Amino acid sequence: MVKVGAVVVLYNPNFDVTKKTLSSLASQVDQICVVDNSPSDHSEVLSGYESVEYKPLLKNIGIAAAQNIGIRYFIDLGYDFVLFADQDSIASEKVVDKLLENHQALKEASIKVGAVGTRAINRQTGLPYVEKSNEIRIIDKRVLSNTSNITECYSIMSSISLIPWKYS
């Protein structure tokens, strides 16, 4: 069975939103590692959540360094995938299953994949975010002819993205 761990990085979080983030992930992954870049401890946010590892840093070391702490945690435990989520990202139902299915479809088609992710939707407008300069560049072609939901792109947002450990 595939093991998926989620890394959620905090920085002075809004507790209500962060609880929604954790709740949206809890049933979809095997464990959540919360790495806290805030100058104070926020362990109270995690009360009531099983399978959550809390790593308070008590200083801001940056999102990438904090994500690396979470990655190392799951590598050491032998996990197959890591899912990144921001403290305010609400994962839709079954999103992890869909990302795993897309990864598997690409692997079966012998397409090497570094990460699979979602399209970011603006909560206020309900519309996908559009490209700003060259931040997110999507190639307008479908990767597999038998699916219309996988699109090749040069980069993705880290939040709600799935990273495999073995390059495939």
Question: Can you say where each PLM-predicted feature lies in the sequence?
Answer:
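Conserved nucleotide-sugar donor-binding
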Residues: 157-168
